[in-house]
Swiss-Prot record:
SUPFAM superfamilies: YgfY-like
Transit peptide: 1-29
Domain of life (superkingdom): Eukaryota
Protein name: Succinate dehydrogenase assembly factor 2, mitochondrial
Gene Ontology CC: one annotated term: mitochondrial matrix
Originating species: Bos taurus (Bovine)
Length: 166
C-alpha cells in the first residue's frame, strides 16, 4: 500500500503487467516485434550501400610481413565466430603456407565485404563463389569441421609466436 502512495507510476506499470499475465490477448498484441525485412513489401530503398575499394594483391610486401598482416587480420574480424575460426586456422596453417596460398588466403579474408559470407562458406552453409574455391578454402573447410573435437572457445594466445621451434 505504501508503494502505491509513494510511486504511483510504478504501481500503474505493475498493474498493466499483471493484466498482461492474466489476459493473453493483451500480451500478444503489445509484445509483437517487427524486424527489418519482415514485410514482403519492404523495398529497402532506405538502405545505404557503401562501396568498398576493390581488393588488390600487395606485391610490394615481403612474405614475413604478409604472414604478420594476415595473422592480425585473421584475429581482428569484427565478429567473434570468424575471430575464433580464422585465428585458430592461421595459428595452425599460416607458417606452412606457400606464397601462392598466402595470396589466396589474403583474397579470401579481405575481398568479401561481409564476414558472414566467409563463415557460411567455411562451414559449408552456403556455396562459395568459384573464385574462392581453391586449396585454401579446402583447408579452411576441413579445419572448420573440427575432426579432433578440440574446444574452440576463443582466439589463441600469442605466446606460440615466441616459442623456439622444436
Amino acid at each position: 500500500m505504501a508503494v502505491v502512495a509513494v510511486f504511483p507510476a510504478l504501481a500503474r506499470m505493475l498493474a498493466v503487467s499483471r493484466r498482461r499475465l492474466v489476459s493473453p490477448s493483451l500480451s500478444m498484441t503489445s509484445c509483437r516485434r517487427c524486424y527489418r525485412g519482415d514485410s514482403p513489401t519492404d523495398s529497402q530503398k532506405d538502405m545505404i550501400e557503401i562501396p568498398l575499394p576493390p581488393w588488390q594483391e600487395r606485391t610490394d610486401e615481403s612474405i614475413e610481413t604478409k604472414r604478420a598482416r594476415l595473422l592480425y587480420e585473421s584475429r581482428k574480424r569484427g565478429m567473434l565466430e570468424n575471430c575464433i575460426l580464422l585465428s585458430l586456422f592461421a595459428k595452425e596453417h599460416l607458417q606452412h603456407m606457400t606464397e601462392k596460398q598466402l595470396n589466396l588466403y589474403d583474397r579470401l579474408i579481405n575481398e568479401p565485404s561481409n564476414d558472414w559470407d566467409i563463415y557460411y562458406w567455411a562451414t559449408e552453409a552456403k556455396p562459395a563463389p568459384e573464385i574462392f574455391e581453391n586449396e585454401v578454402m579446402t583447408l579452411l573447410r576441413d579445419f572448420a569441421k573440427n575432426k579432433n573435437k578440440e574446444q574452440r572457445l576463443r582466439a589463441p594466445d600469442l605466446e606460440y609466436l615466441f616459442e623456439k621451434p622444436h
